[in-house]
Amino acid sequence: MKLSVIVLVASFGFAVALPSKKREETAAENELTGDQQDAEQHMIYAVAFPEIRTSCVIGWKQQGATCERDCECCGVAATCITGDKSTGFCGYHQTPNVLGQGILYTADTIKNGFSAIFCAG
């Protein structure tokens, strides 16, 4: 009788201890999976929107410089971000959403194309 009670208690102890170790391993795996997903998201963003370093035409302004029109800024999608003022600064519209960033980049590129036509005069 004593032996069966000891076997029962030992079996119960093993049954309780085993899942807790599995939970710790699962938590560690989930943490690694989250880190991996963050790294993959960053890589997707970097591939989808590469930062192209090119020299600018003399007279074009770098990112952060003051401007009045889009055609003054260096970069395909660089725009003159004005807000409520007449003068602004050269920069890029940004959003944390990859799809939204692609849409903004495309819209700014098209807008800069038209802006270049009107600024040429």
Swiss-Prot record:
Tissue specificity field: Expressed by the venom gland.
Disulfide feature: 56-74, 67-80, 71-119, 73-90
Primary localisation category: secreted
Entry's Gene Ontology molecular function annotations: ion channel regulator activity; toxin activity
Keywords for the protein's UniProt record, in alphabetical order: Disulfide bond, Ion channel impairing toxin, Knottin, Secreted, Signal, Toxin
UniProt signal peptide: 1-17
GO annotations of cellular component type: extracellular region
Keyword Glycosyltransferase: no
Cell location: Secreted
Function according to Swiss-Prot or TrEMBL: Ion channel inhibitor.
Family: Belongs to the neurotoxin 03 (Tx2) family. 03 subfamily.
Protein name: U15-barytoxin-Tl1a
Organism: Trittame loki
